[in-house]
Amino acid sequence: MKKEKLLQLYKKYGLTQDDVFKHQHYVIITRTGIEKIEAKENIHIIYKSIKAETNFAVIKAIGTLDNRTMETFGSAMMQEYKQEIIKKKNVEGNLIDDIKQTRIGNCNTWYVCEMAEKRAFSRIVLKLTGFYALGVFGEDESEDFKKQ
């Protein structure tokens, strides 16, 4: 059922193999695919900046398709790495110092406001057209969703 519905939507919006790919856990639509969907449906979108700082931004997208209006958010935080020294046992059981590196943030570029807008755009288009209900995400929504 889900696969059939996705195929119907792909045909309806003229999506090709270049517009869609399978991620480890999800189906992903590329930026060009989302642009095709938005253009075909003529979705009206208004953006509002909720927060815009040097390293973090949140954009609200309010989208209208036919007589339905939805809103969603896109956010982006500049990616940083936090390092800390931790104690860990080596193979002999002795405590040694090790470095633990943690990734903080979800955007590897410095233009966080633009990335938040792209994410909000992807989400509102996919929500209004039924793709989100089928577990489909936009390529811009996560750095982990980039095509390999």
PLM regions with names:
Residues 1-148:
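Polyanion-binding surfaces on beta-sheet-dominated domains and ring/shell assemblies
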